[in-house]
Amino acid sequence: MSTESGAHEDDGGKKGVSVLSKHTRADIDRWLLKYPPEHKRSAVLPALSAAQHQNNGYLTVELMDAVAEYLELEPIAVYEVASFYSMYELEPVGRHSISVCTNISCMLCGADDVVRHIEDKLGIKIGESTPDGRFFLKEEEECLAACCAAPMMMVDHVYYENLTLEKVDEILDSLE
């Protein structure tokens, strides 16, 4: 049932919505409060992020369908968003997601060395997870908007800037 603001009080008996945890639905509802009720579509990005977080870092068709139902959208509208943005994963990935910026500023400051170092240290290539499921080295990021602090990477949505190979080792070694 929707409130006047467009947020949901419960799942309203919608079968797919029950796939979303109570916490995920509450997170989506907080975002829905920021938009007019007729613009629920505006909450699709944070809704997908919440669903992905609920599922250990990746989205399933079932979760995307539940998000579509919760936001009263056609499933294809949600699939298009999830498959377009690099922040969403559609297959299982490692617990810690590593994104190295590979745009011009970072590349000129050694991002290619950082990527090679991470690949060698973890024994994986870009787009792969470690066999123990601990790390996932995302496809190259085009730009993470921290050009003045290049090279940089993002690990689990936290920025690490002015990287050296030693600093990369410290960061990765600190993650369980």
Give the ranges of each region predicted by the language model:
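Signature of N-terminal electron-transfer/Fe-S-associated modules in redox systems
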Residues: S2-E176
